Regions:
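N-terminal secretory signal peptides that target proteins for export/translocation
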Residues: 1-25
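Bacterial N-terminal signal peptides
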Residues: 27-41
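N-terminal cleavable signal peptides for secretion/export
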Residues: 44-108
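A short, structured loop/turn motif at beta-sheet edges
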Residues: 48-53, 81-90, 118-124, 229-232, ...
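Short beta-strand segments that buttress and anchor functional surface loops
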Residues: 57-63, 93-98, 128-133, 238-247
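Short, surface-exposed coil-to-beta transition loops
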Residues: 73-78, 110-114, 139-143, 251-255
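Hydrophobic/aromatic-rich structural module bridging two neighboring secondary-structure elements via a short loop
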Residues: 93-150
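Mature, soluble, non-transmembrane domains
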Residues: 131-296
Length: 296
């Protein structure tokens, strides 16, 4: 038991940090939605998607693996807030995780991650900043902004961890635009979607994300009884694969499964944190009031 925990803690600057970025936080952005209209492939009209600005709280906990001799546990909480700022969407995310074991003398490690982003409603402009903490000490910080032209090409200007500017390839999407595109694909009956997405909190380069979209269903695990905002709203399983540096084997760097409602709320998530099987359960859902926007 002690060896397993110690190994996981020593991986704090590699596997754990990458696990944080590639798992919980990046694809909670699936609920970060962009209003507007896109066209689906082959000229099919985009399905209407009505998103729900909200604040959601998730309880994170490790899952037991049958037959495992040693167990490293992780638990925590994630707070996700999506705000309509009239000209764009502001996203606030904060997560805390505690890694430890079942023995009283085991060392515990605490991790915290914060992110604030803003994206214009036309999917062309994007600002981001994130920071990580390990046992209360500040770690990685990232800050920058990106833009995408009507031609599909884009550019990134970074402030942290280093200052610089570089181009983005044609066809790249910003995260909120990609999130809405996923919901539109699901509502239109598509079963698969692949895109290059620039997020900034993971890498200065775009990430290839593939999504397998399942059929929709009502009353998933009776969550609509607990959360009135989910009543009469379909949800569906979405399996995501992330490719940071695609190799010849074609294997993803990370995978994650979500139960996603058609209004953008995530009901459940299943992922891996530093090799530990994890789940995230929706425990609180507050609907945000709409901003009073001035006419342009």
């Amino acid at each position: 038991m002690a060896r397993a925990v110690a190994m996981a803690v020593r991986l704090g600057n590699s596997s754990i940090r990458q696990g944080i970025r590639r798992s919980i936080f990046r694809r909670l952005g699936l609920a970060i939605l962009l209003g507007g209209t896109f066209m689906l492939p082959a000229g099919r009209p985009a399905a209407a998607v009505e998103v729900l600005p909200h604040k959601a709280i998730y309880i994170l906990h490790s899952r037991q693996v049958p037959g495992a001799e040693e167990t490293v546990t992780a638990d925590g909480m994630l707070i996700f807030e999506w705000i309509d700022t009239c000209d764009g969407w502001s996203i606030n995310q904060r997560a805390k995780l505690r890694l430890g074991g079942g023995d009283e003398d085991e060392e515990e490690a605490g991790f915290e991650w914060r992110q604030i982003t803003w994206e214009s409603k036309d999917g062309r402009r994007y600002r981001y900043q994130s920071e990580e903490f390990r046992n209360g000490e500040r770690g990685d910080q990232r800050r920058g902004e990106a833009s995408v032209e009507s031609s599909g090409k884009g550019a990134v200007t970074t402030a942290l961890p280093t200052r610089g500017r570089h181009e983005l390839p044609a066809g790249v999407m910003l995260p909120t635009a990609h999130s809405l595109r996923l919901l539109q694909a699901a509502a239109s009956g598509e079963g698969f979607l692949s895109a290059n997405v620039f997020d900034g909190t993971v890498s200065d380069e775009p990430i290839t994300i593939t999504a397998a979209l399942g059929p929709g269903t009502l009353h998933w695990h009776d969550q609509d009884k607990q959360f009135p905002a989910l009543a009469k709203v379909q949800s569906r399983p979405v399996d995501l694969a992330f490719f940071l540096n695609p190799g010849p084997e074609g294997l993803p760097d990370f995978e994650q499964s979500l139960q996603v409602y058609d209004n953008g709320v995530i009901g459940k998530m299943v992922f891996s944190f530093a090799g530990i099987p994890m789940e995230g359960d929706l425990r609180q859902l507050d609907v945000s009031s709409k901003e009073k926007c001035k006419a342009p």
